[in-house]
Amino acid sequence: MFSGALNYMKGLVGTNENLQVEESGDNKGDIEPEQRKGLLKQLSSYVGKDITSLISLPVWIFEPVSFLQVMSEPLQYNALLSKASKQDSEFLCLAYLAAFNCALYSTAVRTRKPFNPILGETFEIVDKKGEFRFLAEQVSHHPPIGVSETISEDYTLQLETLLKSKFYGNSSEVEIDGTNHFFNKKTNHHYTWNHLVTCCHNIIIGSLWLDHYGDLVIENHTTGSKAVLKFAKSGWLGAGRYGVTGEIVDCEGDVRYRITGKWNESIQLFQVMDNGSSSTTSTCLWEASKEPINNKFLFPRWVEENVIDLNDEYKKILPVTDSRLRADRIALEEGNLDVAAKEKHNLEEKQREDKRQRVAENKEWETAQFKKVDDAKFGYRWNYCGNYWEEREERVKAAASN
């Protein structure tokens, strides 16, 4: 979906806080030779394989967030989703959904891997401005699947991420299976979109850099209109890198708008005239933030304030399953690497022991907040069917009375 795949990929190769996944003339993207040798030794037996769940990585390459927390990071672009929902035109709704999907990839600056969620782990965000609420749950460990639902007065967004990664020697690819569902409450239109391929180049030799490529299709299943975005694969010497082009077409296949730009800079929208040519003027749908990032882990301010923050109020109302409360995450954020490594090991061993217990008792894992249901059109969907928010309200009331 999303930036989560980027951070997962970068975590497979990130080794220190100074590592930048970008081309560089001053070697700031390089890994130390001894670290590369160790990485090569670890990965050499996995060439051509899905390594998502095969490798146990040392704690020093992690960032102090769980992948469920990373799943929430697209909501820093909630304004684009709200703007999409408020459009009278289905084509302009598609345009802002396209901008949202481009914006996700603009934050590819972090080089560490998020922690793998524990089965049954949850994460919530209740927006401080009251614009939305977000809930995610890790519903499967093998394969690793996280699902989430975001609800606002304008839309409902359902996400599913099933990561698959393959190692090819000096590069590695991450693909995400799963369909994202967007429901526009103003028009009652139902949209879906897929994911891109993310490739990390020069894992062993050269300066690390990321590429995101493929076709991203956003479809309006109510009317049949769609936006088709083409993320260019970087060519020789970086030709075409970051480029995005696209078209928004109606149910008859006629082009109504064209999209162009770079996913790390800005996205422009051009209306198509009756003669098929593009308008000479454009609308800027989105422009990358130039806000400086000054913290150790390269978290944007929005992430610091909404994803990482664990204040006294949260401690009183969060369930024990929330990602913020993971002991390994907290220790890592505080710089206690030895404690973080120990707590990470304890969590993983507890998860293995729980699985052995279920196998011995012939029991299947039961999700708490989301259920996989049959869907005639999409095969299946993950629907929220828990009582998380009701229980949260009770915890809030209890905390207020103390």
Curated annotation (Swiss-Prot):
A GO-annotated cellular component: pathogen-containing vacuole
GO biological process: defense response to Gram-positive bacterium; phospholipid transport
Annotated GO MF terms: phosphatidylinositol transfer activity; sterol binding
Coiled coil: 328-361
One Pfam short name: Oxysterol_BP
TM region(s), chain numbering: none
Keywords: Coiled coil
Keyword Transferase assigned: no
Family annotation (SUPFAM superfamilies): Oxysterol-binding protein-like
Family: Belongs to the OSBP family.
Protein name stated in the entry: Oxysterol-binding protein 8
Protein species of origin: Dictyostelium discoideum
